[in-house]
Design a protein with these regions (language model features):
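Regulatory activation segment
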Residues: 124-129
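Short, T/G/N/S-enriched strand-turn elements that build extracellular solenoid repeat scaffolds
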Residues: 56-57, 80-82
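Left-handed beta-helix
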Residues: 64, 69-70, 75-76, 83-84, ...
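Hydrophobic alpha-helical segments, principally membrane-spanning helices and signal/leader peptides
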Residues: 2, 69, 89, 122-123
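Histidine-centered active-site/metal-ligand motif
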Residues: 119
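Terminal amphipathic alpha-helical/low-complexity segments used for targeting or macromolecular assembly
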Residues: 1-65
Length: 162
């Protein structure tokens, strides 16, 4: 199975956790994301090096105007899409299996959590994961320590308080 097929499954909204092949591939990419975030978080890097490492995490290039202050954490990495002139401040955590879309000009404050997964409410099905995308629209500012849950789509030009 390839990443493309896994992303199609994740983006379809189908339950995750019932297909062993999907789970194993997701874990493989999670380990890759852990290695790359560890590289970002454990020593000083110039801004262009951070952008390069972040691009490797998400599997696509970010613009020259991208900014990230470490530490940064993601437990998958391959379902993040970043617009132009985006800034992510220190201590952010992205759980992106359900898809995280951050449009142009967005500012993400210190310690923000973007969580796209939920476990099933039925204890017998608790290992199943339900995902939904988060879409941060153009020029949105998310204040420090805010938690944005699965399925949230912001309006344009708003700020979300901490």
């Amino acid at each position: 199975m390839e990443l493309k097929e896994l992303l199609e499954h994740l983006n379809s909204g189908d339950v995750v956790g019932t297909n062993k092949e999907y789970v194993e591939l997701m874990r493989c990419y999670s380990r890759q994301a852990q290695k790359l975030t560890m590289e970002i978080n454990t020593k000083y890097h110039e801004p262009d090096e951070i952008a390069e490492l972040f691009s490797e995490i998400i599997g696509k290039p970010v613009g020259e105007d991208f900014g990230l202050f470490p530490p940064f954490y993601t437990d998958f990495g391959k379902n993040i899409t970043i617009g132009k002139n985006v800034f992510i401040n220190a201590g952010c955590k992205f759980q992106d299996q359900g898809g995280i879309f951050i449009d142009d000009g967005a500012l993400i404050g210190h310690g923000v959590v973007l969580a796209t997964l939920n476990h099933d409410m039925d204890p017998a099905k608790r290992q199943q994961l339900h995902q939904a995308p988060i879409h941060i629209r153009k020029n949105v500012w998310i204040g420090a320590n805010a938690v944005i849950c699965a399925g949230v789509h912001t309006f344009f030009l708003i700020w979300i308080g901490a």
